[in-house]
């Protein structure tokens, strides 16, 4: 038997001796009191030598099948029933005799999911990652410039229909936004533009033209009939959207009108340029 087991048995014996010692010491005292009480019952009381009438009566005894009475009459000089003190049962403090630590148990089953908690505070900035690979090339951005200046060396007379003024001389045509075959400027960069038109009038004829935006008459260039020809001009600024068209139109022949030019000099010019792109704040 090991030293641990012997120590355990010795501790139990000491604990039982401490707990039951006072109880066992009371047993002889109780037996002596019981014996004295029995002797007093047998001997008559010296204080009352004469027998009382109540004692001569026959004591009550229940008949067969009859229960005992619920109460009984006692004399004041009769000895009372001995009262014994209730002692709690002994208890052993297990913590005094603590054993060795046991083995780790098996892992339990996973519990139910709890309620979703509130969003936590923003975390700290993480370390800088590695440099990524080069991406695919993007599309070319639109040029934020637009400008043109063209001229005409041939005279033009009105007829039964409206006529677009077509130009034959190209001074500036940045990115070819002005179409020399149709005589129209096409807007590729939205924004605010400036345009100007210069013509030479014809003697004894009216001069009647419009600067057009798509199919809308924006401004007129007009000169009355005169004995002498003069240079006449018109200019304006317009806000254009992408795919808008700007061109010059000669009025139809209800009223005879014309513009003058010759092959030696350029009398008719039309110019325009971008002032501010729409993408700029």
Curated annotation (Swiss-Prot):
It holds the Pfam family C1q. InterPro entries: C1q_dom (IPR001073), Cerebellin_Synaptic_Org (IPR050822), Collagen (IPR008160), Tumour_necrosis_fac-like_dom (IPR008983). SMART domains: C1Q (SM00110). Glycans are attached at residue 93. Residues 141-281 form the C1q domain. Residues 51-66 have a biased composition (Basic and acidic residues). One of its GO terms (cellular component) is collagen trimer. GO terms for biological process: negative regulation of platelet aggregation; positive regulation of aldosterone secretion; positive regulation of cytosolic calcium ion concentration; positive regulation of gene expression; positive regulation of MAPK cascade; positive regulation of phosphatidylinositol 3-kinase/protein kinase B signal transduction; regulation of glucose metabolic process. Residues 35-68, 107-136 are annotated as: Disordered. PROSITE patterns: C1Q. GO terms for molecular function: collagen binding; identical protein binding. Residues 99-140 form the Collagen-like domain. It comes from the Eukaryota. Its main location: secreted. Residues 1-25 form the signal peptide. Keywords: Collagen, Glycoprotein, Secreted, Signal. It is found in: Secreted. This is Complement C1q tumor necrosis factor-related protein 1.
């Amino acid at each position: 038997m090991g030293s641990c087991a012997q120590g355990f048995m010795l501790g139990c014996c000491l604990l039982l001796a401490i707990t039951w010692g006072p109880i066992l010491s009371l047993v002889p005292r109780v037996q002596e009191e019981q014996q004295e009480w029995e002797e007093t019952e047998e001997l008559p009381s010296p204080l009352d030598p004469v027998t009382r009438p109540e004692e001569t009566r026959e004591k009550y005894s229940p008949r067969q099948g009859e229960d005992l009475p619920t109460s009984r009459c006692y004399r004041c000089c009769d000895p009372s029933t001995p009262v014994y003190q209730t002692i709690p049962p002994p208890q052993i403090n297990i913590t005094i005799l603590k054993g060795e630590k046991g083995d780790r148990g098996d892992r339990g089953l996973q519990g139910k999911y709890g309620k979703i908690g509130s969003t936590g505070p923003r975390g700290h900035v993480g370390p800088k990652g590695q440099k990524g690979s080069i991406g695919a090339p993007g599309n070319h951005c639109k040029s934020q410039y637009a400008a043109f200046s063209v001229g005409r060396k041939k005279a033009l007379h009105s007829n039964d229909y409206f006529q677009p003024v077509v130009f034959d001389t190209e001074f500036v045509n940045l990115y070819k936004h002005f179409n020399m075959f149709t005589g129209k400027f096409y807007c590729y960069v939205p924004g605010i533009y400036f345009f100007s038109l210069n013509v030479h009038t014809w003697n004894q004829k009216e001069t009647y033209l419009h600067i057009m935006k798509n199919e809308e008459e924006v401004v007129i260039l007009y000169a009355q009939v005169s004995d002498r020809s003069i240079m006449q001009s018109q200019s304006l600024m317009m806000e254009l959207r992408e795919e808008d068209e700007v061109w010059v139109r000669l009025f139809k022949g209800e009223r005879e009108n014309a513009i003058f030019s010759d092959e030696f000099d350029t009398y008719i010019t039309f110019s325009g340029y971008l002032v501010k792109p729409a993408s700029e704040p």
